C-alpha cells in the first residue's frame, strides 16, 4: 500500500510497524464520500482499479497528512475528498503511478523498485515532473489522445 504522505517522505506501510509485514496491517475503513463528476475507476495495464474519494481518519491511518493511497490487494485507489484541484490531480496521477509500478512488476523482489522508499522516490519525482509538463503544455494531453485514436 502506497500513498502520498508528508512525514519524512516515507510511505504508510513503513510507518506502521517496522517488524510487521505490511499485509498484516490493520484494516482501515475511511468514510467514502460521494464525488459527483469525478471518475470512479481507471484502467491500468490489465487491471480495472476502483477510485474512491474518502474522508481520512488520521488517527487510524497513523499519519498526519496523507492525500491518497493505492492498495493493490483491494485493487483500489483512495483519494482524500477535499483536496484542491492541483492536489487532487497530482494525487490521482501519483497513485496511478504506484499501480503502474505494481502492474509492471517493478517493485517485485530483485526489481529496480523493490524497496518501498525507492518506489516512493521515483513515483513522487516523476509525478511532480509530469504534472508540470501537463500544466505548462496544455496541448499535450489533447495531442496524445488524438494520436492514440489514429490507427495508421
Language-model-detected regions and their locations in the chain:
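N-terminal leader/targeting signatures
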Residues: 1-2
Amino acid at each position: 500500500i502506497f500513498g502520498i504522505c508528508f512525514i519524512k517522505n516515507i510511505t504508510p506501510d513503513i510507518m506502521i510497524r517496522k517488524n510487521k509485514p505490511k499485509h498484516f496491517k490493520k484494516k482501515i475503513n475511511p468514510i467514502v464520500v460521494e464525488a459527483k463528476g469525478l471518475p470512479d475507476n481507471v484502467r491500468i495495464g490489465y487491471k480495472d482499479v476502483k477510485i474512491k474519494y474518502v474522508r481520512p481518519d488520521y488517527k487510524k491511518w497513523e499519519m498526519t497528512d496523507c492525500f491518497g493511497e493505492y492498495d493493490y490487494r483491494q485493487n483500489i485507489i483512495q483519494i482524500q475528498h477535499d483536496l484542491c484541484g492541483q492536489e487532487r490531480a497530482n494525487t490521482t496521477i501519483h497513485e496511478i503511478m504506484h499501480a503502474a509500478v505494481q502492474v509492471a512488476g517493478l517493485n517485485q523482489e530483485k526489481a529496480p523498485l523493490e524497496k518501498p522508499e525507492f518506489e516512493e522516490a521515483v513515483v513522487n519525482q516523476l509525478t511532480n515532473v509530469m504534472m508540470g509538463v501537463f500544466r505548462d503544455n496544455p496541448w499535450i494531453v489533447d495531442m496524445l489522445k488524438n494520436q492514440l485514436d489514429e490507427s495508421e
